[in-house]
Amino acid sequence: MKKILFFLLTVAFSGFLTLNVTGQSLGGRVTDLDGEPLAGASVVVEGTFQGVHTDAGGYYLLEGLKEGGHRIRYSFMGYETQSREINVTGDVREDVRLKPTAIITDDVIISATRAGDQTPLAYSNVTGEILEKQNSGQGIPYLLSLTPSFVETSESGNGIGYTSLRIRGTDASRINVTIDGIPLNDPESQQVFWVDLPDLASSVDNIQVQRGVGTSSNGAGAFGASINIQTKGIENEPFAEISSAAGSFGTFRNSITAGTGLLKDRFAFQMRYSDLRSDGFVDRTGSKHNSAFFSALYRTGKSLIKANVILGKELTGIGWWGVPKEILEVNRQYNPAGEYTDEYGIVRYYDNETDNYTQNHYQLIYSRRMNDYLSLHSALHYTFGKGYYEEFREDAGYSKYGLPQVSIGEITFDATDIVRRKWMANDFYGLVYSLNYKKDKLDAKLGGGINLYSGDHYGRIIWMRYPGSTESNHQWYFNNGEKREASLYGKADYSLSERLSVFGDLQYRFVNYSLRGDDDDLKDIGQSHSFSFFNPKAGLFFRLSSGQEAFLSLSVANREPTRTDFKEAAGDSEATPRPERLYDLEAGYIFKSARSSVGLNLYGMYYRDQLVPTGELSNVGYSIMTNVEKSYRIGTELTAGFKPSGFIGLDFSFTLSSNKIVNFLERYIDYNTSDWSEEYKSNNLGTVDIAYSPSITGSSDLYANILPPLKVHLISKYVGRQYFDNTMNSERMLDPYFVNNLMIDFEPSLNSLRGASLQLLVTNIFNAQYESNAYGGNWFEDGQEKTWAYYFPQAGTGFMLRLGLKF
């Protein structure tokens, strides 16, 4: 399999490099109205992959153009974009002067945390057009599926409800996520729960995915990847949009979006409301979601004030336990959540085994352009979250809840059936800011943020079969976590010559995290930790020729453990997790021509004290982690696009990697079955694969324009085998899978509408039977290894039909 893939990719790579390297050329200079050069301005041949950026003197050169007319787009942040029809016959010169925008735009909001065109890092930009076409209600991880080294997972099996992601094997708790430059990660778990932001994609303009350490950002430490989301800007004209979808597994999605357009060239308002429902593929993982997005804007010539409100509410059937290995082959939709045996010996399921949560985001953004070179951006943010999950517990011991035994007549009960709720209530607020300077050869940014978090965790028993004197809604535990985080960064791109620029990025980050109170097992988890991190980054960007670029960078990142990491080690100083450090080396090459593009990236990520998953989960579905002294991820990422004609095209990505722990020491208990005595043992397994890190991933989008309004996509995804613990035992391994989706888009031109679209999406068209995630572990009896494992099976063939109307 590897040899076949390598051969096909080599052929494709060779073919891309030989396409369109000869032909006509177009060159010139891009300046402002005073004739000052605009270094780094974008010059793009519309409708093709081809584009370049101006050098330090503002000069550009497009080579390999076909003879004839081309539409060229010239753009630079803070200036009005120009598009020109240019007839290329022979070598043509075209100089362009760009006019400063009279009004500040939304782009300044996210410029400080994003990789620019000359930043020496590996990243992918996902446009709003792509997000809109792929958005059938699935979580954001499924809309980013085609980016390199990306693996998405779903508890319900159909991408709705609880979803998550990994990039280069890096789990979601290490991936920094911002929305309009504002941190989105939960400070304690350091994850983003996309289920709490249903249909967010309908309000997103574009997303940048940075692989590796990336640029300095706000909020949680980026320890392997970053996701930077920009919400939709304000439309100039009034508009309204309606989108409705229905499909397999009882899935329905409806959304309405409307906006006033610019009023008096100063004010604008827009809103979106979405309702999303699904039964899920796995039994009793159905979900109901409601979300709303409100945005109001006021702007003058040099200032912009924007207020965003994002509201999300979800009710989801619990599916985080997965399917036991012994049942997987018999019933892929089995869900053990809420299972119990009644007094007649009949297996039943508690009908309200659900997760219920509300999360609201409030953001106030201010940006001001001081002059043509200097701008200020700042934002205040507040996130409120509150909710619980409810579950039935059979034969729950009174002592585990700090309760006395109950006597009824002459019978004394030490256990009873209960229904309990575990609550979370949290507040997260802060300030982020950046000062941006861009003139001639220098593009510099100074920024940072201060963020505060307080989260309550508590549990209540709402029903007991034999309550005794215990009152309803009895609270059996309470703890609070507080986190304070402050950061300061400075970053700069400087053009040393027409072909070479240098990049530097320095960040200081301070974190204090404290826990107090008892956990659900009644143990005191009180503790406090402080960390100071210095995260330097440096790199070089080379402009080899028109259409060819290369980069090299070295970055350092540090990350503190999560709440679960600390909680699981409470009371054992030797088990207290250590912070992690990552050294990330990236080298890349980019080639673009009119009909093809290729990106080749080599990376080496070397860790000290990396926290890796043991394969086990906590009782709320978090991975239990352990520090390993030395580990690494090295790999090659290939991205390519090929458009031989206006009729057909292909985009694909492929990653080949090696993800290893050096000298992994397995610790386990060996039980003697004669008397069930325990013997603690260890085994040095040498160099092993890191859990959840497939060595091969790949994706592709083969598309054809059948007729002007009709477009067909065959979207494919391959994920190689991956272990779900660190022992490389085939009993605890996810098999490789290859999944194909068919998408048919029909977009007729209707004079009465601004736009209309009808889409049919057929998922998993070959009905592949696969699991995208699992967890488990082992134990020993009389020296013989045993395995326990739970899997998350994904749905077979399904469909979604979607209608969209724009007014």
Show where each model-derived region lies.
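Short acidic/polar hinge/loop motifs at secondary-structure boundaries
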Residues: L61-G64, R166, P183-R211, Q230, ...
